[in-house]
Amino acid sequence: MIKKKTPYRILIFDDSEGIRSLLYGFFNKRGYEVFSFPNPAVCPISHEKTCPCPTGLACSDFILSDLNMPVQQGIDFLEKQKRKGCKCKNMALMSGDFTESDIVRAKSIGLVLFRKPFSITEILDWIERIEKTIDPDRKLADWFFEK
């Protein structure tokens, strides 16, 4: 029996329907499990006080967020997730108007930055580099499917 590998999973946050649709289609065609949200407030992981994922499991392989969104800024959301113990190691922030302060803050918490308008090949380079390091037999948390 052939063992099916776990598909890569990405969470996408952007208030622009066009950007979400573009990224959803791109990752979906690559075989990813894709969850996209117009802002962090509508994602179940943002409402938990601590990381709800079981020990050793991450909610996703990648989190890609816009900087400027209604309700909560992407950098605030990602920083909060890191403080709560989020186990997703690969997080990136996109914006067309990063300030020097945004750049310094994002880099200080280990975020990859993509300046809009970005080329999809920039994101492809980032994910392909990381895909090579991800164990295909890893398990991902699925607690938020039950919410």
Regions found by a protein language model. Name each.
Residues 75-86:
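Short amphipathic alpha-helix used as the core "switch/output" element in two-component signaling
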Residues 17-42:
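Two-component/phosphorelay signaling modules centered on CheY-like receiver
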Residues 70:
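The feature encodes the CheY-like receiver
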Residues 39, 73-76:
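Acidic catalytic/metal-coordinating carboxylates
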Residues 66:
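Active-site residues of response regulator receiver
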Residues 36-62:
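Acidic, metal-coordinating helix/loop segments flanking the phosphotransfer/catalytic sites
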Residues 93-95:
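Hydrophobic/aromatic residues positioned on beta-strands within the core alpha/beta folds
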Residues 118-128:
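C-terminal output helix
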